[in-house]
A protein has these predicted regions:
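Conserved alpha-helix/loop element of class I SAM-dependent methyltransferases that forms part
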Residues: 94-119
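A short acidic, Gly/Pro-enriched loop at the edge of an enzyme's catalytic core
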Residues: 176-187
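A short glycine-rich, Lys/Arg-flanked "PGG" loop and its adjoining helix->strand segment in the class I
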Residues: 201-213
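Rossmann-like AdoMet/SAM-dependent catalytic core
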Residues: 256-345
């Protein structure tokens, strides 16, 4: 769906591909932070070089630089996988009202929107088909969702244009070479993505550069302990069918979306598992102050705090291990994703 088609369908002017606040955060692919981009008909143009970056398929802003050398094979395999299985996909022809209703009923997304607040710039690294990016543009937030899958981004932009959403913006980028200026976003999120890169630690170091000093960084990963049941199910799900999966049985009502979930969870060509302590090490390396973990670390004030971005104790190593073993009975049935939240330290 093009902007013109959307305008014909709705009888209104199409929303811009990028809001002014998001466009100001972009730079040329591989360029320095003093480069910028301007929006033209069906393309972006570099303000310094004059180079034109045409939209892929006429609708998707394409700022992707191929990965050469380290990790090229993994990047290519994952890109190919998500072109075939855009994730998480939509349940039929969802409108924005339905998406907001679902997001508001989901404890995680509702808490996240509340914690972000109002009038923020938000970067979602690995946005997939864009549901979270669309939801977070509520409260007058301006959101940029980036992904390398054109199939996923196509669905995200189709939803944007069909529903006239001007503050959720999308572009194809490589997470290891982002066409985004450093220190430009209030909140940087990567929820369930870095474990599909060839080096999650290096990918994390790239995305935190895009957060402003004092800004929020949130990373969601497969847990080293809680992912084990998914691995075991993967050995038999081809025989038993998708109903073995808790999410398919209880959450998904669309056959295509259920198939995409099964493929993502059990047939993904590359994934890595991680622990809270590993992420705490990444925080230390990249100047990130620890704030919170979701689900909360047992025996800490994280269990009682009202805000997802509130400063809490990381607990002891023993508490963190016990917490993650406990996740075998909770988040293990839903993909085993945990999130660690921090704040980028101000320069000393």
């Amino acid at each position: 769906m093009t902007a013109a088609t959307a305008a014909e369908m709705t009888g209104t002017l199409p929303p811009p591909y990028f809001s002014d606040r998001i466009l100001a955060c972009l730079k040329e692919p591989g360029g320095a932070d003093d480069t910028g981009l301007v929006l033209e008909e069906g393309a972006l143009r570099g303000t310094n070089s004059g180079r034109v970056y045409p939209f892929a398929d006429g609708t998707i802003p394409a700022l992707f630089l191929d990965q050469k050398g380290d990790g090229e094979g993994v990047t290519t395999a994952i890109k190919r996988f998500y072109e075939e299985y855009p994730f998480p996909s939509y349940e039929g022809l969802e409108d924005f009202g339905q998406l907001v209703q679902k997001g508001s009923k989901n404890p995680f997304s509702a808490q996240l929107l509340k914690a972000i607040g109002y009038n923020k710039t938000v970067l979602e690294c690995g946005c997939g088909t864009g549901q979270l990016s669309h939801y977070l543009q509520l409260n007058n937030n301006h959101v940029l969702g980036i992904d390398m899958s054109l199939s996923s981004l196509g669905l995200a932009i189709q939803h944007k244009l069909r529903n006239g959403l001007g503050r959720s913006c999308f572009a194809q980028m490589n997470i290891f070479n982002l066409a985004i200026k450093d220190n430009s976003f209030d909140v940087v999120i990567s929820h369930g993505v870095l474990h599909h890169t060839f080096d999650a630690r290096r990918a994390f170091a790239q995305i935190v550069r895009k957060a402003k000093p004092g800004g929020i960084v949130m990373v969601g990963l497969y847990n080293y302990y809680a992912r084990v049941p998914t691995y075991l199910r993967s050995k038999v799900i081809g025989l038993t069918g998708g109903k073995l999966d808790y999410v398919v049985r209880n959450r998904i009502h669309d056959a295509r979306k259920a198939d995409v979930w099964i493929k993502d969870q059990y047939y993904n060509p590359h994934e890595t598992w991680h622990s809270i302590d590993e992420v705490l090490g990444w925080f230390e390396e990249n100047g990130i102050e620890y704030l919170n973990t979701s689900p909360a670390i047992l025996g800490t004030d994280g269990e009682t705090t009202a805000g997802l971005f509130a400063r809490t104790s990381p607990g002891t190593a023993f508490q963190r291990v016990v917490t993650q073993l406990g996740w075998l009975g909770t988040i293990a049935r839903e993909g085993a994703l945990f999130d660690v939240i921090g704040r980028k330290k101000e320069p000393s």
